[in-house]
Regions:
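A short acidic, Gly/Pro-enriched loop at the edge of an enzyme's catalytic core
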Residues: 97-109
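A short SAM/SAH-binding and catalytic strip from SAM-dependent methyltransferases
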Residues: 108-127
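Short alpha-helix
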Residues: 175-190
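C-terminal helical/coil "lid" or tail adjacent to the Rossmann-like core of SAM-dependent
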Residues: 203-239
Length: 239
């Protein structure tokens, strides 16, 4: 559940402007694991409407899709009815800090653009993130990997043309997003090593919806990026 966005409402139009970017990078990380792809069980932690699950379901043995928001899970389930009936995916309504999965049972965990939604406290060294990372470590088999799709502060400042129109919201998102150095430290403290970072080209280039200059005037377009929920009504009128 997002600490600031109403995803039950947003779930109905979320896919209008979103796509599963960086899938090839995720696959490269999975291929580097000890098991062949078709034998791997993958956790999609914060699966949302199932964009990444749908993109990867044909590559792995099974996906455990987890999200706290019922609306998001409903949309994900509607995409993957056949796979659910075949037992290739299981859905769980749960926070990602308490995964309903056994210890040492998963081959990999991925979380895509989720971490900045965690209720957390930077001044206390991000205990919410630490809880989540330790939970990932708990469910992973020895040698398993965690794949995090997230934005650093530099990407937030330079990677989205419309963010400069809403500077207060941008600052609020930066305060919710862990800087990359701290992220590495939190992961290491939670038991992860061999850290690697990559910027997928398709995420840098964005999709067609990103280039719509008048998209900011469309409420459905804005719902594709949770930053807009942090824009005050009077500030939105000035955009």
């Amino acid at each position: 559940m997002s600490s600031y966005e109403n995803y039950h409402k947003t779930s109905r139009v979320y896919d209008k402007t979103r796509s599963a970017g960086g899938v090839e990078t995720i696959l490269q990380a999975l291929v580097a694991g000890p098991l062949p792809l078709q034998q791997q069980v993958l956790v999609d932690a914060g699966c949302g409407t199932g964009l990444y699950t749908a993109a990867l379901i044909g590559e792995v043995q099974r996906i455990e899709a987890v999200d706290l928001n019922a609306g998001m899970l409903e949309m994900a389930q509607s995409k993957l009815t056949t796979e659910f009936e075949e037992g290739r995916i299981r859905f769980h309504q749960s926070p990602i800090g308490t995964l309903p999965l056994p210890d040492d049972s998963m081959d990999a965990v991925m979380t895509n653009q989720v971490l900045h939604h965690l209720p957390d406290d930077a001044a206390a060294n991000w205990p919410g993130h630490t809880e989540v990372f330790r939970e990932f470590a708990r469910v992973l088999k020895p040698g398993g990997c965690v794949i995090i799709n997230s934005c650093g502060h530099e990407q937030l400042e330079q990677g989205f043309w419309f963010y400069r129109l809403i500077p207060d919201a941008l600052q609020a998102v930066k305060e919710k997003a862990v800087d990359l150095g701290t992220l590495d430290a939190l992961l290491q403290e939670s038991g992860f090593d061999a850290l690697h970072r990559e910027v997928p080209l398709d995420l840098v280039l964005q999709g067609d919806a990103y280039l719509l200059a008048d998209g900011i005037l469309d409420p459905d377009w804005r719902r594709g990026d949770s930053i807009w929920s942090l824009v005050a009504a009077d500030a939105l009128a000035d955009v």
